[in-house]
């Protein structure tokens, strides 16, 4: 429909067109904030988008305390973002993409492993720690789809 073409500067404007009304919509969640937005802007975006959304997908983080707090306070069901199996080198690279705070927390939590950059890491510990409060996980396949799929099958995480 050509009537909805326009200059959109945020996803909320796209959602408000009604074009996606027949789809389930997930919105971004930032348990540790964002390097690109202030906390108040993140809260404003969450409050504005929540009435149109069905669930929240969080950014990848290793901070289970921040995730637990976020899940408890979220206005919608939360799909917690975790990194699938990947080398430490790959995880450190992606941690940098989601913000300095995440990178520092990740490095602190994994300081003993930081020199073994080729070892494959999995999110099993994060999943086990959150499993009693979280029903849904979103797996970021930073280490590749094949490796992630094999891990999901091995751990029997498929439903």
Listing of model-derived features with the role each one plays in the protein:
Residues 37-48, 119-129:
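Short, acidic/polar
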Residues 81-132:
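Catalytic-face loop-and-helix region of soluble metabolic enzyme cores
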Residues 1, 29-33, 61-64, 82-88, ...:
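Active-site-proximal loop/turn and secondary-structure-junction residues that shape catalytic pockets
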Residues 2-9, 55-70:
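Active-site glycine- and acidic-residue-rich loops that bind
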Residues 68-73, 145-159:
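C-terminal helical cap(s) of enzyme catalytic domains, especially alpha/beta-barrels
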Residues 15-21, 47-50, 71-74, 128-132:
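Acidic (Asp/Glu)-rich catalytic clusters
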Residues 49-52, 80, 137:
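Conserved, mostly hydrophobic/aromatic
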């Amino acid at each position: 429909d050509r009537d909805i073409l326009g200059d959109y500067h945020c996803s909320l404007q796209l959602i408000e067109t009604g074009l996606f009304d027949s789809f389930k919509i997930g919105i971004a969640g930032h348990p540790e904030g964002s390097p690109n937005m202030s906390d108040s802007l993140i809260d404003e975006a969450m409050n504005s988008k929540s009435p149109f959304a069905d669930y929240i997908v969080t950014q990848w983080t290793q901070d289970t305390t921040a995730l637990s707090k976020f899940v408890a306070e979220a206005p919608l069901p939360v799909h917690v973002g975790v990194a699938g199996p990947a080398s430490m080198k790959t995880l450190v690279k992606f941690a940098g993409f989601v913000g300095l705070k995440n990178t520092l927390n990740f490095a602190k939590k994994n300081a003993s492993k930081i020199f073994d950059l080729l070892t494959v890491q999995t999110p099993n510990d994060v999943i086990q720690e959150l499993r009693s409060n979280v029903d849904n996980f979103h797996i970021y396949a930073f280490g590749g789809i094949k490796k992630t799929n094999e891990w999901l099958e091995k751990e029997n995480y498929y439903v």
